[in-house]
Amino acid sequence: MQPTRSVRPFKVVSDYSPSGDQPTAIAELAGRVNAGEPDVVLLGATGTGKSATAAWLIEKVQRPTLILAHNKTLAAQLATEFRELMPDNAVEYFVSYYDYYQPEAYVPQTDTFIEKDSSVNAEVERLRHSTTNSLLSRRDVVVVSTVSCIYGLGQPEQYMNAMVALQVGMQINRDTLIRKFVSMQYQRNDVDFSRGNFRVRGDTIEIIPMYEELAIRIEMFGDEIEALYQLHPLTGDVVRKMDAVSVFPGSHYVAETEVMQRAIGTIQQELEERLAVLEREGKLLEAQRLRMRTNFDIEMMQQIGFCSGIENYSRHIDGRDAGEAPHCLLDYFPDDFLVVIDESHVTVPQIGAMFEGDSSRKRTLVEHGFRLPSALDNRPLKWNEFTERVPQTVYMSATPGKYELGMGDGVVEQIIRPTGLIDPAIVVKPTKGQIDDLLEQIRIRVEKDERILVTTLTKKMAEELTDYFAEAGVRVRYLHSDVDTLRRVELLSELRAGVYDVLVGINLLREGLDLPEVSLVAILDADKEGFLRSSTSLIQTIGRAARNVSGEVHMYADVLTDSMKRAIEETDRRREKQVAYNTEHGIDPTPLRKRIADITEILAREGEDTKKMLEGRGGGKRSPTPNLRREGKAAAGANELETIISDLNDQMLQAAGELKFELAARLRDELGDLKRELRQMEKAGHLS
């Protein structure tokens, strides 16, 4: 079945119009893309509005677009920006849905098998399903993704074939529809009505699709669909009446019965062939292990059409040949889609590296009888497979890599900022007395309520420098690879909010950090040639001071290295061009002011939801928070649960107000569990 996609124009909605270098860059990019050039490079200086340029480019060329970022944080930032710029179009967010993921692995040296362990983020899983739903049902789609988009995903044809289209007046037997939902990997649950489940009440079926927040009610009269409604799953309030609706599967790995039977047959055939090889090599333990694990999976697939780790059998389900590339998100796009690779100097090498890292782990599992050889074909795409699937690519970076520069026919430059801000002045200073000099520079900027970034070469130096500054009375923090993602975001928000003034880091102060309050970037040991002090790294680090009117970069070095020369020359070239443009057009640089977004927004929504729920139940009087041990929660009655929820909500909002975000996040999760428990009690009729 070929998808029928609705057509709606891409449209940018903004109070601003393209300015600076943006109009020229947009026109040249659109011209090259429309002319069919496969690779186009945008060299855009930090803070010149590359994201907005990409949005206006999409509006010009009217193509479904995949935007690739090199980590989840940047992808989330881009998705937010594009949703604001294109509110009438489908802007989707597609990243790995694991909050925590430990892949299965085997360590032969210690004979240790590590079971797959993971924690799935339900909201991110919904967004992934929302992405594929949008791609198969409409053309005006922008997907912001990480390298997750090159990993195996179910076959789009099977996903489409499993979809059920419902409309008022349609003839279908109720039991047939129920069986259809089960085959689509939805579960019947008349008590816990949540995403991925459906419930049946007489001639009424209600289902919450994996990609939706609202439920669908199907009212039947005999074998005819009498009415279709979209409703709030908690309150049951009807949001709107519908004439027709399509429900997509609850899993990307769904397959029809005939397909699954064929797959089971080829899995059994491969198992026999592999067992013969292992036994011939005298690997009897491995053969027995493989036989037990695979037969268990086959039995699960025969009984329920699914098994844990079914993606490892995707080659059989898809009917692919050995070594053939898996289906992935790219296959869900129309043929004429566009790819925009953000921070391409980092993202391009990342895409190319995914395959080897994945296959080396799986080869060990196959050799020791934990998986069939076909599991090797559940993998990310190789670089050449990625480029074969992508019709046209726009590479965006302030420092494009050699690969991108070699692919594009000259770069499109975007150097002039809409705000008139110019690249920071660079000052090279000797290393002797560098710490005392830096301390003096910090004090000057703190008096002006400005922020400072300091980048070092080692974690030890970052820690010692942080301690030294703290003893000198400086409000300082440091950022390194051991700091988890949530804490990194919090640290950056706290820096912008003025909770502290100086952030010390190593390699984390480069791409994508949007910190307009930073007026000084200090680079220690700038003359130590290497990855952290290459011209690319230096230019990216310099860019962190480019969003402030009085931005400066101080490089502490005794020798002017080639990398430093290239970085300084390129920055001076851009700065000269920017100053000339401002002078010609009479522009005064204006400081960039961006909203400081953080976890408090999520917590505020959680607090509002709690307030509404308690008001709906009449509320509960406040009392000290009881012990929250598991057995305490289980024994708590409805009134006690309400009291706990109310107190936890207050504690969560108080923690957020005190900027204790990790505590607030833990309280939010505990609050969510308790509210689910109370709602389930209510649905089950256990509340008076």
UniProtKB/Swiss-Prot annotation:
* Residues holding ATP: G44, A45, T46, G47, T48, G49, K50, S51
The UVR domain extends over 642-677
Question: Keywords of this protein's UniProt record, alphabetized?
Answer: ATP-binding, Cytoplasm, DNA damage, DNA excision, DNA repair, Excision nuclease, Helicase, Hydrolase, Nucleotide-binding, SOS response
Q: Name one GO molecular function term.
A: ATP binding
InterPro entries in the record: Helicase/UvrB_N (IPR006935), Helicase_ATP-bd (IPR014001), Helicase_C-like (IPR001650), P-loop_NTPase (IPR027417), UVR_dom (IPR001943), UVR_dom_sf (IPR036876), UvrB (IPR004807), UvrB_inter (IPR041471)
| One GO cellular component term | excinuclease repair complex
Q: Where in the cell is it found?
A: Cytoplasm
Q: Where is this motif: Beta-hairpin?
A: 97-120
Residue ranges constituting the Helicase ATP-binding domain according to the UniProt record: 31-188
Q: Which residues form the Helicase C-terminal domain?
A: 434-587
Q: Which domain of life is it from?
A: Bacteria
Instruction: List the residue ranges of the region (Disordered).
Output: 607-632
The signal sequence is none
| BP GO annotations | nucleotide-excision repair; SOS response
Listed Pfam families: Helicase_C, ResIII, UVR, UvrB, UvrB_inter
Checking Gene3D superfamilies in the record gives:
P-loop containing nucleotide triphosphate hydrolases, UVR domain
Subunit record text:
Forms a heterotetramer with UvrA during the search for lesions. Interacts with UvrC in an incision complex.
What does the domain comment read? The beta-hairpin motif is involved in DNA binding.
Q: What's this protein's family per the entry? A: Belongs to the UvrB family.
Function per UniProt:
The UvrABC repair system catalyzes the recognition and processing of DNA lesions. A damage recognition complex composed of 2 UvrA and 2 UvrB subunits scans DNA for abnormalities. Upon binding of the UvrA(2)B(2) complex to a putative damaged site, the DNA wraps around one UvrB monomer. DNA wrap is dependent on ATP binding by UvrB and probably causes local melting of the DNA helix, facilitating insertion of UvrB beta-hairpin between the DNA strands. Then UvrB probes one DNA strand for the presence of a lesion.
Q: What is this protein called?
A: UvrABC system protein B
Q: Which species is listed as the source?
A: Clavibacter sepedonicus
